[in-house]
Structure formats: C-alpha cells, structure tokens
Amino acid sequence: MGPSDPDDDGRVDEAVVVGGGAAGLCLAHRLTGAGVGVTLVEAPDGPLRPAERTWCFWEAGTGEFEEAVVANWRRLRVRGPDGHVVESDPAPLRYRMVRSGAFERLVHSRLEASPTARVLRATAHEVRDAPDGAQVHCTTPDGRPLALRGRYVFDSRPVRATPPHRTLLLQHFRGWFVRTSAPVFDPEVADLMDFRVPQPRHGLAFGYVLPLAPDRALVEYTEFSRSPLTTSAYESALRHYTTKVLRLGPLTVESAEQGVIPMTDAVFPRRTGPAVFRIGAAGGATRPATGYTFAAVQRQSRAIAAALGRGRAIVPPPYGRRAMAMDAVLLRALDTGRVDGPRFFTDLFRRVPMDRVLRFLDDGSTPWEEFGIGLRTPVGPMLRTALELPFLSRRTTGRSEESPR
C-alpha cells in the first residue's frame, strides 16, 4: 500500500516504524522483504517534514538501492592545508550519493507492492509500551487522534537531548548545488576533505566537493566544532571557498542544504521499553568520528529484519566496542587541541591505504588493521587522551540536532 488515510481500525502490526527518514525507510523496506507486517508513520507535509537531504556512503558492487543513487565516484581525494594531495581508488569500493527524495520514492514504490505494508501520514507524539506490544499515539493531518498498535515499535525520531557524554562536537555544514559557466569539475573524483580553508580557533574546517557533471557539483563548507555558525557565516565561507580556493569562476547556486550532526562518545540506548526500540541516529548509528550514518542504518536494518523473521526482536549495536573506543579518543584529542585536525586526517589518508580507512570507518577492519591505523596517528597525544578518558565524568548538555549525512 502507498500513503493511506489514517484509520484506527483495530489493526495490530508486527512492527510499527516511526519516522520516514533513512532509518525508517530502510527498516520498513527490510521488514516487508522479510514478510513482516509493518506500518511506517511519516510526518505530514509541513514544518515537521524534513527538507531534501543528501546521504553519502561507500559500497562495493551494485547495491539494492542503486536506482536512488544520483552519482558515484571511483576516486577520492584529500587535500592538506598546504595543498598536498592524497588521491586514491579504493576499489572495490565506490563513494555514492543518494538524495532523500529519490530514496523515498523508490522505497515507497516497493512498499506499495506489498500487501503487508502501509505508509501513514501522521504526527507521532508518544510511544509507550502496552499489553502484548506498544502503542504510538499520533494526530492525523485533519487533527484526529490516532493510536497505532504493534508487537514492536521502532522509533527513529531525534532524541530530545544527547545522552551523557565526555565529548560532544558538532559536525555542521552548508552546501551549495552549483552550476558553473565552464567545465571545471572532474566527475570521476570526489574531494572528501579539502583543508585549504581558514581554520577556526577551535576544531577544524574543510571543503567537500562532489561533482555531478563537468559543470555541476555539490560544494560544502564543513566544521567540526562546539557550535554551529549563522547562515550568513556559512555563505561567506562558501563564497571564499568557491572563489579564492577552488576558483570556479562565474557560477549559479541552484539550491542549498544545511545540517548539524552530533559527534559524541555518548551511548545511545537502543531499547527504551520491552517492545520499543530506537533506530538510526537516535539509536547510535552515526559514526562518532565522521558523522556518516547511511551504511550503518542499512546494516542495522538487515539485522533487525533477520531477527524478526526468526521471531526475535533485537537492535544490534551499529559499531563494535573497539571502533567506539578509538572514536572516543579521537574526539577528545580534537576537542582538547592535542592533535591538529587537518594534519591528523591528511596524514591518516597519506599513511594508510584509503580502502583500509574506509573499511575501518564501516566497522569492517580487523584488530591487526586497527592496531596499524593507531600506530599511524600521533601516538603520544592519543595515548595521553586514552589514559585520561576513564577518569572523566559524563555530563548531559542541550538538545540533540541530527541531519545525518
């Protein structure tokens, strides 16, 4: 079924998925494929419905969501503050871009073909346990209350506040989709990090360039720091980057996107009740050291669907303990200024094969590979930070904002 009129008809689904972002769509798709009855609750049109977003990830071969991939790149590049270039083909991996609108249309078309799936437009207010499952209390677009029931509920809505943590940085960015008057981009190469931009007093900043054609690209200015900028400050940084650094010449900004992604060593609870689970960024699927989320969401969705198909409900951790420990050390080292961010990332990609770095960031590396990666970082500052972390208390700060990349 496609998006349908809400009707509290006494239906009890095996699963209710709250939120129609990457995590909710992926899980609804996986559950439907596993033969699990599912209702996907999406926000109605209006201020609660998120704007078009860009999600990127790397993958080998052809994925099952290839129809929603708008571009992919065979070669990846990192530029140091001095212009030093590290460029590599991380075969068999390719870097891919998905636009949220295309992804939503693709998943909706697949859900429409299933008699066990439905998509409801409603505003979810409360999720709570109930006898033999859980309930989602909603309001329909015309203002009527609606209670949805499921044996299990998977909630992807952003958490109200970041859980207790020792370190919290924000990855915040604004990007322009630009069209230039001359063919200035190489569609085969994506710039993951370009540190030739002025660096902030605290944290780090870089450019991010994803060419879509010789004369079109997504160009972003990104910072890892404690506070986001104003829109005018992002615009100024983008003007400087496109004119003074990239020297793109005359261009037209066709659209823009902006977001904030928490980078933290907080532990996000994945189960909040006997039948209620958190998924996606709300369930810890954002990689703390990078802000990437989409690939982990897919892994998590596959595992949940496989477990439910066997009659069990689990939401596995998106990343292993070693990866989380290494990320916690890096975040603290960046936040304290013990390591120079631009130099750290430039040297990491220069000293470690790019395919190995990407596998590590996707939680696919071996302990020996991770040991080797650790030896190619500033050992002294990182070791000092690792020894300090167990003695630091976790604290709670303000609201968590999420716009996963």
Where are these regions (language model features)?
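Flavin-binding catalytic cores
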Residues: 227-257, 277, 299-320
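FAD-binding beta-loop-beta segment adjacent to the flavin cofactor pocket
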Residues: 198-204, 259-278, 333-339, 346-350
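N-terminal FAD cofactor-binding segment of flavoenzymes
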Residues: 30-83, 102
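N-terminal Rossmann-like FAD-binding beta1-loop-alpha1 element of flavoenzymes
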Residues: 5-40
